[in-house]
């Protein structure tokens, strides 16, 4: 069973957990190329700026963390496995109760429409996963998160492993060595997420 201390130690050293399936073995990942979102240069796409401007979604923090992480754990398509095992979910629920793991949620018409969750340590936010029930909901939550982190003085938004969706949101890849320098600098800051 993964312990809270294991997670905190791993993240401080550039590792993160990933399961091979819902009930599968948990591995510790430290990719050579790390996906990060440059907070200073982030600019939402024109289409996302239009969606944000329509104010279709209301953003909340930490109001339904467990719902968010469980929605993130659902396979994206039929037959697709998830990397979020029950073991990882349970330890992140503990981290949330300790004030380390957080959710950013998009709500529409009183219903959860999408969102994301991650871990906050010092001036680093480790984005774990996103989901949506309604189109653009997770993108709006993500754009809100970037602005929030900038206002709070965060230095690093770690997106972990690049994929086309993250790339469309402005993530870039940096070498492991550069990531570790940014991580050490960010962990040296004292910032409270909420």
UniProtKB/Swiss-Prot annotation:
Tell me which species this is from: Chlorobaculum tepidum (strain ATCC 49652 / DSM 12025 / NBRC 103806 / TLS) (Chlorobium tepidum)
Indicate what this protein is called per its UniProt record.
Answer: Leucyl/phenylalanyl-tRNA--protein transferase
According to its UniProt record, where is this protein mainly located? cytoplasm
InterPro entries named among the record's database cross-references: Acyl_CoA_acyltransferase, Leu/Phe-tRNA_Trfase, Leu/Phe-tRNA_Trfase_C
Q: Does the keyword Transferase apply?
A: yes
| Listed EC numbers | 2.3.2.6
Q: Which UniProt keywords apply?
A: Acyltransferase, Cytoplasm, Transferase
Task: Identify the domain of life.
Answer: Bacteria
GO cellular component terms given for this protein: cytoplasm
User: What compartments host this protein?
Assistant: Cytoplasm
Outline what the protein does. Answer: Functions in the N-end rule pathway of protein degradation where it conjugates Leu, Phe and, less efficiently, Met from aminoacyl-tRNAs to the N-termini of proteins containing an N-terminal arginine or lysine.
For this protein, the record's Gene3D superfamilies field holds: Leucyl/phenylalanyl-tRNA-protein transferase, C-terminal domain
Family label: Belongs to the L/F-transferase family.
Question: What is any one GO biological process for this UniProt entry?
Answer: protein catabolic process
């Amino acid at each position: 069973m993964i312990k809270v201390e294991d997670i905190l130690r791993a993240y401080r050293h550039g590792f993160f957990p990933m399961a091979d399936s819902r009930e599968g073995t948990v591995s510790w990942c430290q990719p050579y190329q790390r996906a990060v979102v440059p907070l200073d240069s982030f600019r939402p796409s024109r289409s996302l700026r239009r969606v944000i401007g329509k104010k279709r979604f209301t953003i909340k923090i930490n109001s339904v963390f467990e719902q968010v992480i469980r929605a993130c754990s659902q396979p994206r398509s039929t037959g697709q496995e998830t990397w979020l095992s029950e073991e990882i979910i349970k330890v992140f629920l503990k981290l949330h109760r300790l004030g380390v793991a957080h959710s950013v949620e998009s709500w529409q018409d009183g219903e959860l429409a999408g969102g994301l969750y991650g871990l906050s340590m010092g001036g680093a936010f480790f984005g774990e996963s996103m989901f949506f029930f309604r189109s653009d909901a997770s993108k709006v939550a993500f754009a809100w998160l970037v602005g929030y982190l900038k206002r709070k003085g965060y230095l690093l938004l770690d997106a972990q492993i690049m994929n086309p969706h993250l790339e469309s949101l402005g993530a870039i890849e940096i070498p492991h060595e550069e990531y570790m320098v940014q991580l050490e600098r960010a962990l040296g800051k004292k910032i409270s997420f909420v």
